[in-house]
Design a protein with these regions (language model features):
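Ubiquitin-like/PB1-type beta-grasp interaction modules and other compact soluble beta-rich domains
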Residues: 1-72
């Protein structure tokens, strides 16, 4: 299974952690497609703790983390 950890607004309606079958997604962009998250809304995308590109492949037992832009004042 691929573990997808969602942060901030991405959790709304999806929860904190989503699990995906590795047969259903082959790259980071496909993970976003399944979750219906537009790529332009992603500020940070990590695969196993490393900054990654949406073209990077994902495989069984990977842990992904997806962060939207965060602001504060």
């Amino acid at each position: 299974m691929i573990e997808v950890r969602l942060f901030a607004t991405f959790r709304e309606g999806r929860g904190k952690i989503v699990f995906m079958e590795p047969e259903k997604v082959s790259c980071a962009q496909e993970v976003l497609d399944v979750l219906e998250i537009p790529a332009e809304e992603v500020a940070i995308f990590l695969i196993n703790g490393f900054h990654s590109k949406l073209e990077d492949s994902v495989k069984d037992e990977d842990v992904l983390a997806i962060f939207p832009p965060v602001g504060g004042g």
